[in-house]
Amino acid sequence: QQDWLMRQIEAMIQAVLAVALGTSANEQTATQIEDSSYGKMLEKMIDDGDICAAEDLLFNDLDQSDLSWLQIALDFYSKLNNCSDDYLAMHDFSREEIDQGLRYICTLFGYDFLVSN
């Protein structure tokens, strides 16, 4: 079940990257999050186990008029999706919450048609 959801999340991320940002499905998205100070901060929060706080911060700071924020959000959820289920559970987060957050972000940016069930 969780492996299936992991693959679904990754497929959604790749679809949004391809359509919204013109990035091919084979290109890695990690460079944006690693190159920005904001992305590094989110990544450190994930590594420190502050996943809920990192997601809250992202939602609060997000600028829907700037597609670079979509890239940062996609990178954030991709990084979370690569975490183990045990790590997520240890920090009160779940793969289902990754799925929900990703769908919410896509809806905010008008790409909900790419991630609908």
What kind of feature is each model-predicted range?
Residues 36-53:
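Alpha-helical segment of the N-proximal tetratricopeptide repeat
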Residues 12, 41-45, 77-78:
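Conserved small-residue packing positions in alpha-helical repeats and bundles
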Residues 2, 40, 44, 63:
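Short, charged/polar micro-motifs that form catalytic or ligand-binding hotspots
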Residues 9, 16, 51, 57-58, ...:
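Inward-facing hydrophobic residues that define packing positions of alpha-helical scaffold repeats
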Residues 74-117:
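Amphipathic alpha-helical binding modules
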Residues 17-38, 56-88:
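Short, charge-rich amphipathic alpha-helical segments embedded
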Residues 1-4, 27, 90:
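Non-transmembrane, amphipathic alpha-helical segments
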